[in-house]
């Protein structure tokens, strides 16, 4: 499977997810006076995160044989909820197993159990959990729903960029948070195809600048020894799919913990 996405891939993903995930709002922000800054409110997704786009995109694209074998994912956060919600959207007919660390908060595990999925708490660390999930995939032939290393997932994440470009065709810059990079790969493909002059700017915490360092080295750092950060959801290594789309990324901005704190306060006080 090619690691490069096309606009057609993103549009096809939108058709798959559209029945369950309508577009999220694009709203002006009051947090940056004098700047036409708009927020793509992915917090309005049913699971509170854009991750559900990619999970549903992949899971709804499976053929009959793949569906019988089921899917599995390892996650301690938003991706797990996205996979669980996608399973519900598909009527519970797709056997879905979600692996979470034994140390995962019980409130989060309880939320996952509300969906038609088999939740398995395995391993003391996230790496242990991933190892268990990989063993399960090998034993069962289930399809892996990776958080970012699958073009069907990245295409699903890219539907957010498609919505922005269609709603705001004069957009000059998109600021995209980057962890593994599935979001920026999909968003960049869609936005650049529809708005050729748009600048795609990756944003990472200085506790985990894996993309910046990968670009400097000329190879993706698949794992990265991130320091503790408020933006823990984007900590860690960069994926191969994201790195394959590095030509579409115009700049990488690295922010400090103090800047992240200031941004959170500004958003809460000005944009609620």
Feature locations, PLM:
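PLP-dependent amino-acid enzyme catalytic core
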Residues: 1-272
